Amino acid sequence: MSVISMKQLLEAGVHFGHQTRRWNPKMKKYIFTERNGIYIIDLQKTVKKMEEAYNFVKELAANGGKILFVGTKKQAQESVKEEAERCGMFYVNQRWLGGTLTNFATIQKRIKRLKEIEKMAEDGTFDVLPKKEVIRIKKEQERLEKFLGGIKEMKELPDALFVIDPRKERIAVAEARKLNIPIIGIVDTNCDPDEIDYVIPANDDAIRAVKLLTSKIADAVLEAKQGEEAVVAAE
């Protein structure tokens, strides 16, 4: 049985690509037809590619691998946070800070600062500081939490990236490629699939489509974790 059905994909509008004038010819093999100036994605290929991505993620997670979910466009922000948290993985859903992967040590310093501020809030340091200073530090905390909250516990580079719209997240994709980190991507008809190791051809603009596919990636992680728990229980 496939991990996702044609019916689910159709209902979520996964088949709607971009306007025909905004396309990348490299996506031609994933296009079924054209309707009213819009490309229609071949959902049979989406089912097959989703299966490949699902199995890759499941295997990676079963071996203790960590995945970073990346989606900073409005339609993806909520799903990325919810699904990454649901399966216990990391996420970036605001702005991708340049160097998040390629300058990991600097990002870790910012995370350390965020944790220091959190500790100050807990241990009563705020109570003895001047009010103005507390307000300034809290603003800094808010900013750091906004951009780094989803990778706060990421102690080392992730083993894979799951990206919604590689065109929008081109900096993240370039950094992962530089470091040979595999990339799974929801790739619409206007994107370059060559940059992505596991291409899921799909509509990357509809909230329902993004939610459905992101939830399947999270399901793959959870299935792997349940497998681990079953093995531990059997021992």
From Swiss-Prot:
Domain of life: Bacteria
GO MF, any single term: structural constituent of ribosome
Keywords: Ribonucleoprotein, Ribosomal protein
GO CC terms in record: cytosolic small ribosomal subunit
Gene3D superfamilies recorded: Glucose-6-phosphate isomerase like protein, domain 1, Helix hairpin bin
Gene Ontology terms describing biological process: translation
Pfam families associated with the record: Ribosomal_S2
Keyword Electron transport set for record: no
Database matches in NCBIfam families: rpsB_bact
Protein family (similarity comment): Belongs to the universal ribosomal protein uS2 family.
Protein name, entry field: Small ribosomal subunit protein uS2
Taxonomic source organism: Geobacillus sp. (strain WCH70)
Lineage: Bacteria, Bacillati, Bacillota, Bacilli, Bacillales
Gene that specifies this protein: rpsB
